[in-house]
Design a protein with these regions (language model features):
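Conserved acidic E/D residue at the C-terminus of a beta-strand in Rossmann-like folds
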Residues: 195-196, 288, 311
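C-terminal substrate-binding/catalytic core of Rossmann-like NAD(P)-dependent dehydrogenases/reductases
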Residues: 226-240, 244, 291-345, 354-355
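Mid-domain Rossmann-like dinucleotide-binding core that forms the NAD(H)/NADP(H) cofactor-binding site
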Residues: 128, 134-224
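NAD(P)H dinucleotide-binding glycine-rich loop of Rossmann-like/cofactor-binding domains
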Residues: 35-37, 46, 75-169
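C-terminal hydrophobic helical "lid"/dimerization subdomain
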Residues: 238, 261-264, 271-275, 323-378
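ADP-ribose/adenylate-binding Rossmann-like module
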Residues: 249-254, 265-294, 307
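Glycine-rich beta-strand-centered segment in the early N-terminal region that forms part
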Residues: 2-14, 29-88, 132-136
Length: 378
């Protein structure tokens, strides 16, 4: 261990995140500005559960305890004192010091050369990054703490309430978890899922989506939403239609030029609550990342739509609890309100990493959603 207050974790399970997938297959742009905040060489894998193998912890954890990793390497783990304004408020995913302190640049485990990831038998973790797994929560449930919290954080960006109509674009890991949370944690929310593949559509229905629409053809997506919410549709002959009414909120877990263009066409024009000044409609929350291209954005200004970025998770306030998103998740599990583990469709030993990544990539062929690595306890 290079620095004080660091531990060694022995990996039990690690999940393939969409960001891992994009990096392995070079699915992105070389000029992505995030490259200024990462360093090489890298060992990927930031969705990790395992055992505390070595190291002392101020949180009274002991060797052999089950741990879920909080992968963000911000001020505390970088030995920066005083911490930045974001870390002081519990929003360490917005840390101002990802390229400073005692560690090489990196925003989270797996993209710093000092903080290697969970696609390995062992990995380092600052004690602040180690969260104990409650006894009644399974390894698989705990492994989904990170993607669940990403979805939960995105929903809390808008004031979802009874009667809200929400669309979720994309039914991969984040999209399906967003659907599950909206239907199982919130009351009386209508959810429209837009999926690419039939096995994703089936899981969206299993998780409670009120309407599931195939993402192609795109004009049909708009038409089906107009039918569902019973609103007027506007179009010129042979041109892509759009709506002034539509859904209140869209959670875009793909964030491609096409999904953003469809999004600004299906989201209802802006409406504000006169008492709280919160936006009751006209908001797109973006959690996905795709390469930029041109798209037609006229409805964006016309309907005064707000497009909000949502980055990972933080200390969240919900149902009179203010705590890290992982602990909200644990509470929902313990109360029996939901179980997201059906999204885990494939499990591989690390030695079969090529097969695992190809399975994650060929979603239609293998009917894959969440692909994970499993390590022996011995």
């Amino acid at each position: 261990m290079k620095f004080k207050d660091w531990c060694v974790l022995k990996t039990k399970l690690s999940g393939i995140c969409g960001s891992d997938h994009k990096q392995i297959f070079l699915d992105g742009n070389r000029d992505n500005p995030m490259t200024a905040l990462i360093s090489w060489p890298q060992v990927l894998g930031h969705e990790v559960v395992g055992y505390l193998e070595k190291g002392k912890s101020k949180s009274n954890l002991k060797v052999g305890d089950r741990i879920v990793l909080n992968p963000w390497i911000s001020c505390l783990s970088r030995q920066i004192n005083p911490p930045c304004i974001a870390c002081q408020s519990g929003k360490n995913t917005l840390c101002r010091n990802f390229n400073k302190g005692t560690l090489t640049p990196g925003i989270h485990t797996g993209n710093s050369s000092d903080v290697t990831g969970g696609f390995a038998e062992y990995l380092p973790a600052h004690e602040s990054m180690t969260i104990p797994i409650p006894d009644d929560i399974t390894w698989e449930q705990a492994l989904l703490s990170d993607p669940f919290s990403v979805a939960f954080h995105s929903i809390l960006k808008v004031p979802v309430k009874p009667g809200s109509i929400c669309a979720v674009y994309g039914c991969g890991n984040l999209g399906l978890l967003t659907i599950l949370i909206l239907k199982k944690v919130f009351d009386d929310v209508q959810v429209i899922a837009i999926s690419r593949f039939s096995h994703q559509a089936a899981m969206a229905k299993k998780f409670g989506a009120d309407l599931v629409i195939n993402s192609s053809p795109t004009n049909r997506v708009i038409e089906e939403i107009a039918d569902h919410v019973n609103c007027d549709i506007f179009s010129l002959k042979r041109k892509r239609p759009w709506l002034i009414e539509g859904v209140d909120y869209l959670f875009d877990t793909v964030a491609s030029p096409e999904t953003l263009e469809i999004g600004i066409r299906i989201v209802k024009a802006r409406k504000k609550d006169t008492e709280t000044n919160s936006l009751l409609s006209g908001v797109i929350v973006v959690t996905g990342v795709s390469s930029p291209k041109r798209y037609e954005w006229t409805p964006w200004y016309f309907k005064e739509i707000s497009i909000i970025g949502s980055n990972a998770f933080a200390i969240e306030e919900f149902e009179d609890h203010r705590e890290h998103a992982y602990f909200h998740y644990f509470r929902f599990l313990e109360e029996g309100r939901l179980n997201p583990t059906p999204i885990i469709t494939h499990k591989f030993p690390l030695e079969e990493y090529k097969k695992a990544f190809l399975t994650a990539r060929a979603q239609k062929k293998y009917k894959s959603i969440k692909v994970i690595f499993s390590f022996n306890d011995n």
